[in-house]
Amino acid sequence: MEARAILRHTPTSPRKMRLVADLVRGKQVDAAKAMLAHSTKHAARTVLQTLSSAVANYSQANPEKRLDESELIVKRIYVDQGVTLKRILPAPMGRAYRVRKRANHLTIIVDEANPTDEQN
C-alpha cells in the first residue's frame, strides 16, 4: 500500500526542484532524509518536509504495520510546473523587463521496499 504527499504552488523554479528530486528517487527513506538534511540546495528543505509528510501519511493509512523508515522507499517523485507569475522590472530608457516568477507542484509517493503478497 503506497502513500503520497503533494505540495502545490511552491515558489521555486521546477528546474531547481528537479535537481533535488533526482537525488532521492528510488532511495530508501532514511537514506533520502540523510541526503536532504546535508544538501546545500534551498529546495532540499522543501523536499524533506514533503517526504516526512508522505511517511506520516503511510503510517496513518497502515496503522497495523510498524515499519521502520529503512523499509520504505521513495517509489516515485516528480515535479510539475505550476503557475508562472509575470512581474515587471523597470529598465533603462523607459523600457520594462518581464520577470517570470515560477512555481511548481511536488508529488512524492512512498511504498514498502519489498511488498508482501496479501492475496492468499
UniProtKB/Swiss-Prot annotation:
Describe, as the record does, how this protein assembles with itself and its partners. Answer: Part of the 50S ribosomal subunit.
State the species of origin.
Answer: Chloroherpeton thalassium (strain ATCC 35110 / GB-78)
Give one Pfam hit by family name: Ribosomal_L22
Name a GO molecular-function annotation.
Answer: rRNA binding
Know the name of this protein?
Large ribosomal subunit protein uL22
Q: Which biological process terms from the Gene Ontology are attached to this UniProt entry? A: translation
Keyword field? Ribonucleoprotein, Ribosomal protein, RNA-binding, rRNA-binding
Cross-referenced InterPro entries: Ribosomal_uL22, Ribosomal_uL22_bac/chlpt-type, Ribosomal_uL22_bac/org-type, Ribosomal_uL22_sf
Function per UniProt: This protein binds specifically to 23S rRNA; its binding is stimulated by other ribosomal proteins, e.g. L4, L17, and L20. It is important during the early stages of 50S assembly. It makes multiple contacts with different domains of the 23S rRNA in the assembled 50S subunit and ribosome.
Q: Which GO terms describe its cellular component?
A: cytosolic large ribosomal subunit
Q: Which family is annotated?
A: Belongs to the universal ribosomal protein uL22 family.
What gene is behind this protein?
rplV
